[in-house]
Amino acid sequence: MSIRTPPRLLELAGRSLLRDQALAMSTLEELPTELFPPLFMEAFSRRRCEALKLMVQAWPFRRLPLRPLIKMPCLEAFQAVLDGLDALLTQGVHPRRWKLQVLDLQDVCENFWMVWSEAMARGCFLNAKRNKTPVQDCPRMRGQQPLTVFVELWLKNRTLDEYLTCLLLWVKQRKDLLHLCCKKLKILGMPFRNIRSILKMVNLDCIQEVEVNCKWVLPILTQFTPYLGHMRNLQKLVLSHMDVSRYVSPEQKKEIVTQFTTQFLKLCCLQKLSMNSVSFLEGHLDQLLSCLKTSLKVLTITNCVLLESDLKHLSQCPSISQLKTLDLSGIRLTNYSLVPLQILLEKVAATLEYLDLDDCGIIDSQVNAILPALSRCFELNTFSFCGNPISMATLENLLSHTIILKNLCVELYPAPRESYDADGTLCWSRFAQIRAELMKRVRDLRHPKRILFCTDCCPDCGNRSFYDLEADQCCC
């Protein structure tokens, strides 16, 4: 039978304080700083709204990381916090202990509450003070407003959740008294008229990461384009499932693509660009690449249709010479010359760490073109080549060229064509024999950290199975 540790005197005193309906600001003025976080959590979870209002006004830290607490269904408590902030923003004389400058609603703040909770349990507050997370400021608005509100916007439903609705309404009514700072914006499904009203409330200069994944057609993209051009500190842009409407003529398509790509001329901080299933890139990649103003660290173009001329323009783009990540998976290259890809790999050989060429349809006759350049990518730590129908001989040749890449930690290759029957079914006994042969040859050449071989996609579930050189079971 376990024996529960009795509550410490400080805990008992704090709980008694919360039960006091006549809690006064003068009482909080004398409350030890270390009691504020655990008591605030207690008040929030128990919906002690009047106590919350006063505790916000007397908060002894510059930052209030509220996001972990609003995961609890406590809209009433959340509103009480906003009411407390109202008092701070509108009253002329602030409480003596008032330090609050940042209301942090980003999804990265749980450590603050964990540290202070453990300190309360152990009675060791000195370590908690040492482990405080540094306040994240917004340099753009420093000194202009008394309060900055950090928020991450995930627009994933037709309507906003009740917390975000409550917050944005509150911000809208007090826009001259605070600064709303959004660094991460995800649009996963919402009518654009709703998105527009939210973007008008946010300082677009603050946004550093944008992800759009909601099957937009080009006419909708044109409505978003002007906002993109104002995100001058944008570092990461992810676009997925952008389609060309059948009602858009080739002339209209060219005009829309031009409007969109010219916005990149204003993005002087962009480092990561990812585009998945973006159909308007075909024949227009040069327009986008010519508007890039920075050297990219990450470039992902996946499951798109590109012309051979697009690949040529990519290999000639000056903004890709310092890439660390290159992902071209799902780009069909079967009937193309891979000389542009060879030139591209030569350009990024000094910096490239991650290369994904899955499902590009690369065949035996094409592989030799990229081998010399690939073998000079000495910083490469991950290489994936799954889904390309190559023979055993070509696979062995490929492995012999990657042998000198000493930083290579993870390698993924397709099961060679000899592993399959004429109807495309994997022959397990033959595959096991091939793996044994490959294991011997690879061990003779080097000691790889991890090599996996993958089968073709299952016609029933659509998934692949992965096997290492020795295991008989799947390594998924």
Swiss-Prot record:
Origin species: Homo sapiens
Record's GO cellular component terms: Cul2-RING ubiquitin ligase complex; cytoplasm
Known role: Substrate-recognition component of a Cul2-RING (CRL2) E3 ubiquitin-protein ligase complex, which mediates ubiquitination of target proteins, leading to their degradation. The CRL2(PRAMEF6) complex mediates ubiquitination and degradation of truncated MSRB1/SEPX1 selenoproteins produced by failed UGA/Sec decoding.
Pathways per UniProt: Protein modification; protein ubiquitination
Any GO MF annotation of the entry: ubiquitin-like ligase-substrate adaptor activity
Superkingdom in the source lineage: Eukaryota
InterPro entries: LRR_dom_sf (IPR032675), PRAME (IPR026271), PRAME_domain (IPR050694)
Subunit structure: Component of a CRL2 E3 ubiquitin-protein ligase complex, also named ECS (Elongin BC-CUL2/5-SOCS-box protein) complex, composed of CUL2, Elongin BC (ELOB and ELOC), RBX1 and substrate-specific adapter PRAMEF6.
Record keyword Repeat present: yes
Similarity comment: Belongs to the PRAME family.
Keyword Glycosyltransferase included in the entry's annotation: no
LRR repeat residue intervals: 97-124, 179-203, 204-230, 231-266, 267-292, 293-324, 325-345, 349-376, 377-401
Name of the coding gene: PRAMEF6
Name by which UniProt lists this protein: PRAME family member 6
BP GO terms, sorted: negative regulation of apoptotic process; negative regulation of cell differentiation; negative regulation of DNA-templated transcription; positive regulation of cell population proliferation; proteasome-mediated ubiquitin-dependent protein catabolic process; protein ubiquitination
Entry keywords, A to Z: Leucine-rich repeat, Repeat, Ubl conjugation pathway
